[in-house]
């Protein structure tokens, strides 16, 4: 957790490697913004769904007919908001995996990597996993927050995408205090369950990443992430949080 006003940081194994799961879509989005800054891609460019880029798992685009065209802007929203795997494949195919890999050091990523095998949605182990760390994910969010990811207009666009409300608030977003706002991305794959977020609060903003792995129960992992979020809610909201928090019934 990093306080974005004071820079004060609380860490627990921040450099441990975890399968990135769908958190990898955040640096993919940043790479796409670099491609646009370099004049090689546009938010208005339209890409077509085909059998080659249709991917199962998360997202609704897999149900769209072949030939359906969507703007890059919309694909990025689907990729983050629905964690849509088809949108992700379409964006990756347009940029090229090699280009995206080259941007990771440019973004400031030393341990986070992306590989073709790592993009697989299968549940078992893969030859080359996409790994990340809590420190690097939090660093990316801080750069976006401060307008330092690619450039200020790109950071503002990405922040708005991350702020879009998900269908059902969960993990770090569950039980968000009134008047707060969250920009976040979740991940869930190969026994990994994550959430990485920026919280906007009346008492100061902060970034927080929780990575969990080797989970036997995704439900328990999600509950743990939510409990950790609530500890920070109490810290930043103080007595106000306890006053509005739902009380448990006594038995």
Predicted features and spans:
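Structured C-terminal helix/loop/strand segments within mature extracytoplasmic catalytic/sensor domains
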Residues: 94-96, 139-170, 181, 185-251
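Acidic helix-start/capping segments at beta-turn-to-alpha-helix junctions
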Residues: 2-4, 43-60, 95-96, 161, ...
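Active-site-proximal beta-strand/loop segments in catalytic clefts of secreted hydrolases
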Residues: 2-4, 51-52, 80-83, 94-95, ...
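Mid-domain, small-residue-enriched loop/turn segments at the edges of structured enzyme/sensor domains
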Residues: 89-149
């Amino acid at each position: 957790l990093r306080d974005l006003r004071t820079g004060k940081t609380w860490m627990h194994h921040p450099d441990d490697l975890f399968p990135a799961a769908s958190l990898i879509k955040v640096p993919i989005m940043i790479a796409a913004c670099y491609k646009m800054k370099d004049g090689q891609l546009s938010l208005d460019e339209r890409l077509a769904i085909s059998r080659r880029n249709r991917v199962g798992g998360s997202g609704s685009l897999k149900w769209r007919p072949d030939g359906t065209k969507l703007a890059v802007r919309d694909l990025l929203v689907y990729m983050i908001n629905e964690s849509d795997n088809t949108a992700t494949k379409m964006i990756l195919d347009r940029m090229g995996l090699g280009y995206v890999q080259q941007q990771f050091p440019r973004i400031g990523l030393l341990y986070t990597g992306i590989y073709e095998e790592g993009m697989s949605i299968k549940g078992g182990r893969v030859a080359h996993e996409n790994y990340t760390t809590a420190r690097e994910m939090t660093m990316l969010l801080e750069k976006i927050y401060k307008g330092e990811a690619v450039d200020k207009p790109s950071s503002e666009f990405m922040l708005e995408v991350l702020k879009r409300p998900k269908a059902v608030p969960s993990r770090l977003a569950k039980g968000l205090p009134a008047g707060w706002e969250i920009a976040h991305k979740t991940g869930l794959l190969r026994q990994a369950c994550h959430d990485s977020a920026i919280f906007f609060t009346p008492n100061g903003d902060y970034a927080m990443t929780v990575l969990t792995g080797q989970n036997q129960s995704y439900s328990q992992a999600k509950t743990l992430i939510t409990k950790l979020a609530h500890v920070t809610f109490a810290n930043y909201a103080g007595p106000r949080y306890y006053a509005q928090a739902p009380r448990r019934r006594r038995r």
